[in-house]
């Protein structure tokens, strides 16, 4: 099973307690071109995989010689890291050397292993892998794909072919020779060709590095009346994700993860879900604070609109024991009943309505 390319072995943690099995697997590969990583270290983010490095990533079986343990550890984030580490045209294989495209479809809901295989296969496809002719998971080589040219202006060309202009055909054929001995039909055709050549409009070349698409022949043609219209179907983006996908936890990209002890702010055009997460946390904290405030304020006595406390200072010289009640808080004693009220003139009527001062 030795390979000439660079190989990455993904080992479940149970093999660490069976070194004889792990050594046997390592012995079947070229040691200087083989790397070994433990799945649990990848899951906890203790190690990271280099980009576009491996030709083959081999998923090892557990101590029970099944893929049940690796399936339970491999998440969408791990598969994305594996795909990122594969070279173009690199393959993801399993130790049992059975292609995932040839495995059971997983329709038997009683078989948990089939369901795990189906989930793993779907996650691999969502991460960008495809099946080759042998049913193996392959990372497509995007650079090798050919570009399809856009053939625009076909309606204009068909219209010119069906209804040619008058400059391209003669109005009639005259076989009588002219005065200079040249056939009239030949001279007419020559003149027509000369006219066509000289009247061809000159087009200004497009600026370097700028591409232009001519949609002038498509104006005014409704889509339902277009016999050769595009076959593209409109896709409802809400149907692309199911209930299981919506219920999955949000995987935060490494660049969006905050530093220890700090809270990272969401980007202005956040698309990873961090903005919604922070907004939900703020709402929860605000609701908790409001509830705690209501609990504290519950035993406090509150005066209704019909309850009015009136302090009468119409009598001159009527002051408190300190004699500074009307001067303001800076001059009032600690037990003054008017602490918090603005300064007022002796003899002025002060009303307290719903804890609001009305002079």
UniProtKB/Swiss-Prot annotation:
One of the protein's GO biological processes: iron-sulfur cluster assembly
Molecular function (Gene Ontology), one example: metal ion binding
Regions of compositional bias (Low complexity) in chain numbering: 184-200
Gene Ontology CC terms, in alphabetical order: mitochondrial intermembrane space
Swiss-Prot/TrEMBL cofactor(s): [2Fe-2S] cluster; [4Fe-4S] cluster
Linker: annotated segments: 149-246
Binding residues annotated for [4Fe-4S] cluster, in chain numbering: 322, 325, 333, 336
Main location: cytoplasm
Region span, N-terminal SAM-like domain: 1-148
Location of the protein in the cell: Cytoplasm; Mitochondrion intermembrane space
Annotated stretches, region: Fe-S binding site B: 322-336
Short motif (Cx2C motif 1): ranges: 322-325
Record: residues binding [2Fe-2S] cluster: 256, 267, 270, 272
Presence of keyword ATP-binding: no
InterPro entries: Anamorsin (IPR007785), CIAPIN1 (IPR046408), Dre2_N (IPR031838)
Subunit description: Monomer. Interacts with TAH18. Interacts with MIA40.
Domain observations: The C-terminal domain binds 2 Fe-S clusters but is otherwise mostly in an intrinsically disordered conformation. The N-terminal domain has structural similarity with S-adenosyl-L-methionine-dependent methyltransferases, but does not bind S-adenosyl-L-methionine. It is required for correct assembly of the 2 Fe-S clusters.
HAMAP family assigned to the protein according to its UniProt record, in alphabetical order: Anamorsin
Protein task: Component of the cytosolic iron-sulfur (Fe-S) protein assembly (CIA) machinery required for the maturation of extramitochondrial Fe-S proteins. Part of an electron transfer chain functioning in an early step of cytosolic Fe-S biogenesis, facilitating the de novo assembly of a [4Fe-4S] cluster on the scaffold complex CFD1-NBP35. Electrons are transferred to DRE2 from NADPH via the FAD- and FMN-containing protein TAH18.
Protein's name according to its UniProt entry: Fe-S cluster assembly protein DRE2
Classification of source organism: Eukaryota, Fungi, Dikarya, Ascomycota, Pezizomycotina
Designated gene of the protein: DRE2
């Amino acid at each position: 099973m030795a390979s000439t390319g660079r190989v990455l072995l993904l080992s479940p943690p149970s093999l660490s307690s069976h070194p004889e099995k792990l050594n046997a697997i390592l012995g079947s590969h070229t040691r200087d071109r083989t790397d070994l990583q433990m799945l649990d270290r990848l899951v906890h983010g203790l190690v990271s995989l280099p980009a576009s490095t491996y030709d083959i990533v081999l998923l090892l079986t557990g101590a029970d010689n099944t893929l049940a343990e690796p399936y339970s550890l491999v998440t969408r984030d791990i598969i994305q890291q594996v795909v990122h580490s594969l070279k173009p045209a690199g393959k993801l294989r399993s130790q049992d050397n059975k292609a995932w495209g040839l495995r059971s479809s997983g329709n038997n809901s009683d078989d948990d292993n089939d369901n795990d295989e189906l989930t793993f296969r779907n996650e691999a496809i969502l991460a960008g892998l495809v099946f080759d002719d042998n049913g193996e998971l392959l990372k497509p080589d995007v650079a090798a794909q050919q570009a399809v040219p856009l053939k625009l202006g076909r309606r204009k060309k068909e219209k010119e072919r069906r209804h040619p202009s008058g400059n391209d055909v003669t109005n009639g054929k005259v076989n009588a020779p002219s005065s200079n001995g040249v056939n009239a039909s030949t001279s007419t055709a020559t003149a027509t060709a000369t006219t066509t050549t000289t009247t061809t409009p000159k087009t200004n070349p497009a600026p370097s590095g700028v591409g232009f698409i001519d949609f002038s022949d498509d104006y005014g043609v409704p889509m339902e009346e277009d016999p050769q219209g595009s076959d593209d179907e409109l896709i409802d983006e809400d149907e692309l994700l199911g209930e299981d996908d919506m219920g999955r936890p949000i995987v935060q990209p490494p660049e969006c993860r905050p530093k220890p002890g700090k809270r990272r702010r969401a980007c202005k055009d956040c698309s990873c879900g961090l903005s919604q997460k922070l907004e939900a946390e703020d709402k929860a904290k605000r609701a908790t604070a409001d509830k705690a405030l209501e609990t504290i304020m519950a035993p406090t006595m509150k005066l209704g609109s019909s309850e009015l406390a009136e302090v009468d200072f119409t009598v001159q010289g009527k002051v408190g024991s300190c004699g500074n009640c009307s001067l303001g808080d800076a001059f009032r004693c600690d037990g003054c009943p008017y602490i918090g009220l603005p300064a007022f003139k002796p003899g002025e009527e002060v009303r307290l309505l719903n804890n609001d001062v009305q002079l």
